[in-house]
Amino acid sequence: MAAAARVSEVKAEGLLRGACAALAAAAALLVGLSTQTETVLLVRKKATVKDVQALWVLAMAAAAAAGYHLLQLLKCLYLGRVGGARPCRRSSRALAWTCLLLDKACAYTTFATTVAAAQACVVALDGAHAVQWTKLCNIYTRFCEQVAGSLVLGMLAAVGTAVLSAASARNVFRHYSSLETYAAH
């Protein structure tokens, strides 16, 4: 019964990892491939992701998160197929700790880069009157809409990664004996 429950947990983790990988990849592609060219005062200007450093960092971090989730998805698929073969307790404990730390790092990085990009986009949306920056989203509407979509996808990927991090923490603590075992000795 415990083995069947573990296999279903691995499948659920695999589904969530696949969803997070898809969301992060979509966010990276949407922001990374967004461009728009407009004529402003007889000058053609092209808006790209490299114009705002925070958007470029978001594209790279989301792509890295998608790659990480794909690697972890392969691990889930492997464990789902070889569910009966248990590695030694010490190596599985080390693997659980490694996955927890990597999941936490991925969650924090995805969340931080998405929020930083959102903060940079607020300036593009509202402008900064103190330094006479105009509202860029009035000019590059489609570009701003695509960036907003990638911010939503990035935040959903960050939330999914946080849920995976909680599942990884549960997996780590599963490797340690309960307090009742220590009380009996």
Curated annotation (Swiss-Prot):
Topological domains annotated Cytoplasmic: 1-13, 75-104, 168-185
Keyword Membrane: yes
Residue ranges, Extracellular side: 35-53, 126-146
Disulfide bridge map: none
Gene Ontology CC terms, in alphabetical order: plasma membrane
Cellular compartment(s): Cell membrane
NCBIfam families registered for this protein in UniProt: A_tha_TIGR01569
Complex formation: Homodimer and heterodimers.
Assigned protein family: Belongs to the Casparian strip membrane proteins (CASP) family.
Protein name: CASP-like protein 2C3
